[in-house]
Amino acid sequence: MLPGCIFLMILLIPQVKEKFILGVEGQQLVRPKKLPLIQKRDTGHTHDDDILKTYEEELLYEIKLNRKTLVLHLLRSREFLGSNYSETFYSMKGEAFTRHPQIMDHCFYQGSIVHEYDSAASISTCNGLRGFFRINDQRYLIEPVKYSDEGEHLVFKYNLRVPYGANYSCTELNFTRKTVPGDNESEEDSKIKGIHDEKYVELFIVADDTVYRRNGHPHNKLRNRIWGMVNFVNMIYKTLNIHVTLVGIEIWTHEDKIELYSNIETTLLRFSFWQEKILKTRKDFDHVVLLSGKWLYSHVQGISYPGGMCLPYYSTSIIKDLLPDTNIIANRMAHQLGHNLGMQHDEFPCTCPSGKCVMDSDGSIPALKFSKCSQNQYHQYLKDYKPTCMLNIPFPYNFHDFQFCGNKKLDEGEECDCGPAQECTNPCCDAHTCVLKPGFTCAEGECCESCQIKKAGSICRPAKDECDFPEMCTGHSPACPKDQFRVNGFPCKNSEGYCFMGKCPTREDQCSELFDDEAIESHDICYKMNTKGNKFGYCKNKENRFLPCEEKDVRCGKIYCTGGELSSLLGEDKTYHLKDPQKNATVKCKTIFLYHDSTDIGLVASGTKCGEGMVCNNGECLNMEKVYISTNCPSQCNENPVDGHGLQCHCEEGQAPVACEETLHVTNITILVVVLVLVIVGIGVLILLVRYRKCIKLKQVQSPPTETLGVENKGYFGDEQQIRTEPILPEIHFLNKPASKDSRGIADPNQSAK
C-alpha cells in the first residue's frame, strides 16, 4: 500500500509542478463517482434515435472536495459544432486535404453544481473528467491523474490574488468602423438589433505549425484541445444570447502558410489578407482565429480588430497558445472575440459580482461573465453596425426540434425558459421546471416589469423621431405591440422630406452617414453625372449593367456630396469637378461605390424627396400617390386618431390601444349584423316570389280558356307592340345583372327588370 502511494506521488510531481507555473494551487486528489439519473429533462421528444450514441445527453458526477460533497450536473453541448464542420490538413508537398467528418457524437458538456445557484462548468468526458468549474467566485480545474487506472483526478484551485506567471495583455489595431447607413430598417435589421434574439458566430480556427508539433500527435489530440476551447467560449457567450459555433479547423502541418513576423500586429495584417484571399474561397465563416505557438517577441498575448465582426479582412484575431491550460487560452479567445464585437477593456467602475470579467485588461484567470459596461457596448454595437452575418443559423432546420426544459425556447407546456440553471439569471422563471414562480404573470418582454405585466397604455417603445409613434402595452401581453410609424408621405423636417417607413430620409443626412458630419449635399449640377451609366453615376443595376438615369430621375440615382472623409472600409469614393455656369465656379461632386455590399448605399435612399409631392423609388422619381397608399383614419380612438403606415388606426400617447381594438371590434360586429339581416330579407323575398309563381300556375290550370291577351312591352320603343300568347308570370332577376341589348342598343324585353 505504502509503495503504491509513494509511486503515485512521484507521478503527480510533474503534473502539480506544471500547474504551479500557471498560478493555480491547492491541488486535491478526488475520485468522481457517476450517479444514476433520477429524471430526464426532456419533454418526451426523441432526437436522432437511429444513431447509437457513445456519450449520454445528461450526466451526474459526485465529487468530494474539501470535506464537502458536490454533484456536477452536465448536459451535452449541442451548439458548439456546426453541421458543416470541416478539417483541413496539409501533406509534405503542401497539398491541402479537407474532410467533413459527420460528427454525430462528442464528449463535451456544460453544466452546473447542484444546489449552487451561482455555478458553472465546462467539462470534457473523453478520457476522464477534464475542464473547468466554478462555485461563486472560486474557480477550479479538474483533470485525470496521468498514468492512473483507478479513476483518480486532481482538482486545482485558481488563486484570485496571485497573478499568473504568464500574465495576459492584448492590443488592438488602430481601426475605426463606420456606422452602417440604410434607406430603411428591414426585418433582418430589427432582428440583429434585438437584444433577446439569438445570434450565432460561425468560428473557424487555424493552428500554426508550432501548435501542431506540440499537440498534434495524434490529430484528435489537437482537435479535442480546440473543441474544449470552443466549448468554453460558447458557455461564456451564451449569457449574451450568442452561440459560438465551430465550423472548421485548419492545421498547418509541416510548415506555416504565412510568415509569422516578430511583430504581432504585422502578423495580424498578413493573416487577415491570407484568410480573405485563400481561406474564404473554400469555407464560409464569421470570424477566424489563428492559434500561434510562437512567442512573436512580444508580451502581448492576443490581438484583434475592434468592432470588425462580419467585415472582410477585419473579422480576425490572433491568440498565443503557449500554455497547457486550455481554459486560459479559451478565455483569451473569448476576450479577443469581445473586442471584435465592440467591447472595450473593463475599467473601474465596470466590475462583475464574481470578481473577474471577461473583458478585464489583465485576463489572468478564467472569467465567465461580462460586465454591464461590456453588455451595453455590445448592444450599442448591434444598433450601430448591424453585423447581419450573426443571423445565419449553422444547424439543420430541425435542430431545435429536440424539446427540453433549458433550451431557451418556449416549448409546449412551458411558461418560460431561461436556459440551464447555471445560465439562468431571470428571477421570474424556475429554471428547473420552466414555469413562472408563484405570484408572477410574466418572465420577459418589454411589457413585463418586476415579473408582472404592465398596465394598458404604458409606453414600451418610445417614438424614435417625428415619423415614429410610441408603442403602448395592451395590458394582457408581456410583448410590446408591433412597431407602428407615421404614414408614408407625411411631411417632416420642415417639409424638407417625407416620412418613409418611420424615418425622414434627406440627402443631407445620407451624406453625413456615408462620410461624416462635415459632409453635405453637393450642387444640383452634380446629378447630371447620373446620365453617364457607370458605377459612379446610374439609376438602376440590372445583371451588373449600370443603367443611366432619365432626365426626370437624375436626383434618384447616385448621391453627390461635398466635404467629409470616407473610410476605406466601405469602398472607394470618386470626386468629379464640374463647372457651375451661373456662378462661374468649380463644384465638387463626391460619391461612393462599395466593394462588398449587395445593396449600393451610395444610391439616393428610397423615400427621399425629389420634388414637391415626389419621392425616389427604385431609381425613379415618382408621384407619392403612385408609390404610397394612405388611409383616412376614422375616429376609432377616444380622440386624436392618426394614420399609421399599416393602414391602421393608431391612438395618440396616453390612450390604450385597446380603445382602437374595441371600436374596430364593435364596427366589425355591426357590419356582420347588417349583412346577416340583408341575407335573411333576401331569402324571405325569394321564398315569397317562388310561392307566388306557384299560385299563378295553379290559377291558370283551374281557369277556363280565354282569348289571347295583348300586353304592351314598356321596354320596347319600336313601331309595333309585341304580343304574348302565354300567361304572364313574375320572373326573378339578380339585382346586379344588366338587361341584355340588341345591336340597336334596345333592351330585350325578356331581360327587363320587373
UniProtKB/Swiss-Prot annotation:
Changing residue 173 to P: Detected in a melanoma cell line. Residues 402-488 form the Disintegrin domain. It is a single-pass type I membrane protein. Glycans are attached at residues 84, 167, 174, 184, 584, 668. Its main location: membrane. Disulfide bonds join 310-389, 350-373, 352-357, 460-480. GO terms for molecular function: metalloendopeptidase activity. The keyword Phosphoprotein does not apply. Residues 199-394 form the Peptidase M12B domain. Residues 1-18 form the signal peptide. Gene3D superfamilies: Collagenase (Catalytic Domain), Disintegrin domain. Residues 690-754 are cytoplasmic. SUPFAM superfamilies: Blood coagulation inhibitor (disintegrin), Metalloproteases ('zincins'), catalytic domain. The chain crosses the membrane at residues 669-689. Residues 19-668 are extracellular. Changing residue 593 to L: Detected in a melanoma cell line. Keywords: Disulfide bond, Glycoprotein, Membrane, Signal, Transmembrane, Transmembrane helix. One of its GO terms (cellular component) is cell surface. It is found in: Membrane. Required for normal male fertility via maintenance of epithelial cell morphology in the caput epididymis and subsequently correct epididymis lumen structure required for sperm development. Plays a role in sperm motility, flagella morphology and tyrosine phosphorylation during sperm capacitance. Plays a role in normal expression levels of HSPA5, ITM2B and ADAM2 in sperm both prior to and post-capacitation. This is a non catalytic metalloprotease-like protein. Interacts with ITM2B in sperm; the interaction increases following capacitation. Interacts with HSPA5 and CANX. This is Disintegrin and metalloproteinase domain-containing protein 7. It comes from Homo sapiens (Human). The lineage of its organism: Eukaryota, Metazoa, Chordata, Craniata, Vertebrata. The gene is ADAM7.
